[in-house]
Amino acid sequence: MRIRIAHETVYSYAVPAHAVIQTLRLTPRNYEGQHVANWRIDVDQDCRLDAHEDAFGNITHTFSCAGPIQTLTVRVDGLVETTDTAGIVRGAIERFPPGLYLRGTDLTAADAGIRAYAEERKALGGDTLATLHALLDDLSRDMVFDKDPTHAATTAVEAFALKRGVCQDFAHVFIAAARHLGIPARYVGGYFLHADGTVDQEAGHAWAEAHVPDLGWVGFDAANGLCPTEQHIRIACGLDYLNAAPIRGSRHGGEGEFLTVKVVVDQALRQVQVQ
């Protein structure tokens, strides 16, 4: 499948910013099942994008620009060719042993409720993969996708108590439960092509990966109740959202920030343009 991405992020400031520094994790890598045909990042300021790799092997671009800055736009356009690998990740850069991904974070800590939920799925019997699929299926059923009650700093505990959230929250709850069971798990950010023909989206997508004996890393998209397919584009991974956030940074000044995000994910059968 050929998938085209157009992702535009616009920062507007009521009071112009004096300076901005940002790190972007917006560039995919090639690995089995994913080939980047072309990819471009543009920033509408006088700055240079410095490419690096972070500790998790993600491609990053860092830039700084001096003000006054009234608006700042980061735009991504790209084309990626994908094939279905049944959710199994092969050929990705692995800088750490799987055990590192047992490390908890504030966003992925498990409380008594998440621990009990995880133990109930394990008690159903079966191997690690069966337990993870039970967790995937039941989280998809028991939590409701709802963008209103949560935000970027919502923890797994908070989202699970609400039984609501966005893809980031589903991923954090899945990770918290898996780690409680002693299964290494990590957060993945990327894009998802909806099967219903929806191309205009308000943000990118997120899911989890867990390390399974004899298979390695396997993806679990709890928000959609499936393992990643050729409809998924994998961008960055880490212990939680903070390690894989598309854009993170800081600014001096720039009070009254307003953020607008437009994402278009479509098969490369027709021209895609963010209006």
What are these regions (language model features)?
Residues M1-E119:
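Linear, non-domain "peripheral" regions
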Residues M1, H7, Q22, W39, ...:
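Structural beta-strand/beta-sheet cores of well-ordered domains, especially the beta-sheet scaffolds
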Residues V20, D169-E255:
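Hydrophobic/aromatic-rich core segments of domains that either
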Residues H18, Y31, Q70, D106-L107, ...:
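Short capping/connector residues at structural and topological boundaries
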Residues Y11, V15, L24, Q34, ...:
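Flexible, active-site-adjacent loop/turn segments at secondary-structure boundaries
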Residues Q273-Q275:
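Alpha-helical and coiled-coil interaction segments, frequently adjacent to or embedded
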Residues V80-D84, R90, F96-G165, V173, ...:
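Secondary-structure boundary elements
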